[in-house]
């Protein structure tokens, strides 16, 4: 995919930093163990960071650890002053709801909810009053160019439109961290360009966007670059 996205605006200093400290993950295997991620220390200094590497290299392991979906064998993940892995499972879920947004290769929209209801869903879980969540959802859908599709079910949206709904849902809680796993993988070139344009906006606004991709053209759009191979993470300039 050759991406034609507008040149980035200057980065805004992030309000909350995402940091890893000697982060590692091993899994038992027969009589030994497999190291999926080796001691990784890094500060994600806002903007967009691409994570590239071959299949099975440890990219998904890193993303799951950053999100608190998986438990590290050692080290820490901090968002601001909070070590997310020191929280209980319920505490991590609540923390993610307030501070994280997620965009996956498959949009993962709830099939029986409209576009607007899907965007409202995280706000409903957070206890935001109905009127406020409706207003915020409509505003985000307008920002992603879907103000005329608010009442459509996911089955009545194109792949690109559904992914735009997913981005609106990811941003509606104003998260500090946005994690995106191959968000353009299932899309045609033009739809992919639209999605990348939308992902660069929060990066310019001081949010930390971590983007997993296999596409070098997509990775080149990021401000910072990480490469993962055999569990080793290197920072590329």
Segment roles from a protein language model:
Residues 1-26, 234-237:
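ABC-family P-loop ATPase nucleotide-binding domain
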């Amino acid at each position: 995919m050759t991406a034609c996205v507008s040149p980035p605006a200057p980065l805004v200093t992030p309000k909350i930093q995402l940091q890893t400290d000697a982060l590692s993950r091993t899994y038992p295997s027969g009589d030994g163990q497999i190291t999926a991620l080796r001691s990784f220390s890094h500060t994600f200094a806002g903007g967009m960071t691409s994570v590239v590497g071959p299949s099975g290299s440890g990219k998904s392991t890193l993303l799951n650890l950053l999100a608190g979906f998986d438990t590290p064998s050692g080290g820490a993940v901090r968002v601001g002053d909070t070590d997310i892995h020191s929280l209980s499972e319920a505490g991590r879920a609540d923390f993610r709801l307030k501070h994280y947004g997620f965009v996956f290769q498959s949009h993962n929209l709830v099939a029986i909810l409209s576009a607007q209801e899907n965007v409202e869903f995280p706000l409903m879980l957070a206890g935001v009053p109905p009127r406020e969540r409706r207003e915020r959802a409509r505003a985000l859908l307008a920002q992603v160019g879907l103000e005329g599709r608010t009442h459509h079910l996911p089955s009545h949206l194109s792949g690109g439109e559904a992914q735009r709904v997913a981005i609106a849902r990811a941003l509606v809680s104003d998260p500090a961290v946005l994690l995106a796993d191959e968000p353009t993988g299932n899309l045609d070139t033009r739809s992919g360009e639209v999605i990348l344009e939308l992902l660069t906006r929060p990066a310019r606004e001081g949010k930390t966007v971590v983007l997993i991709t296999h596409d070098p053209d997509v990775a080149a759009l990021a401000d910072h670059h990480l490469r993962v191979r055999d569990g080793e993470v290197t920072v590329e300039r």
